[in-house]
Amino acid sequence: MNSAPAIQKLLDELERLPGVGPKSAQRMAYWILNTDRATALRLAQSIIEVKDTVHFCSRCFNYAEGDVCEICASTKRDGGIICVVSEPRDIPPIERTGVFGGVYHVLGGALSPLEGIGPDDLHVAELMARLGSEDVGEVVLATNPNVEGETTASYLARLIKPLGVKVTRLASGLPVGGDLEFADEVTLGRALEARREL
């Protein structure tokens, strides 16, 4: 796109978004240019509003507009079960299942010695404080099934188990509709280990 300076500035900013390359940025820029002014302003205002009003929940570190997030504030949630996730973006997929009725704790990342991320860089101390002050019977470790997530889950399990709190890990295995021939050995091994009686 042979761009005016304002268009080039928009393209440069759009390309900074995760997963957006030059072509996607160009499509978005064209859409913004071709849409009516009111729609473009609503988009801009939404971005400003979310940056001005959304912050971290003081209890679980999920996104919130008030002091605590809607999940922590709900009287319908079971505060005795805490699901530990790495990032706030991990909560919506779990919520969409409609299966989990407890509350969450967001670590703000995962342990990664290679990247210099240790326990003090995450919300581990805050989790331990919650376990000491709230009546929690179970902690579900829902970190990602990668090296960092497994390391984080193992570390947390070692910290939490001595408190007498039940520690569980999300089962990992084969996706529904998947074929065995395409499953990697680790996934298939975990599926076998987490098998259940019918």
Question: Which role does the model predict for each range below?
Answer:
Residues 2-8, 16, 26-91:
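Cys/His-rich Zn2+-binding cysteine-cluster or related metal-binding knuckle/ribbon modules and their
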Residues 25, 74-143:
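Extended interfacial segments that mediate partner engagement and assembly in macromolecular machines
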Residues 128-140, 144-198:
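Long C-terminal interaction/binding lobes of large macromolecular proteins
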Residues 13, 17, 35, 50-53, ...:
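Conserved, well-folded catalytic cores of nucleic-acid-processing
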Residues 2, 35, 39, 115-119, ...:
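Catalytic cores of large soluble enzymes that bind and process phosphate-bearing ligands
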Residues 27-28, 42, 55, 67, ...:
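Residue-level signal for pocket-adjacent positions within structured domains
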Residues 8-12, 26-30, 41, 45, ...:
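Solvent-exposed alpha-helical segments within well-ordered globular domains of core cellular machineries
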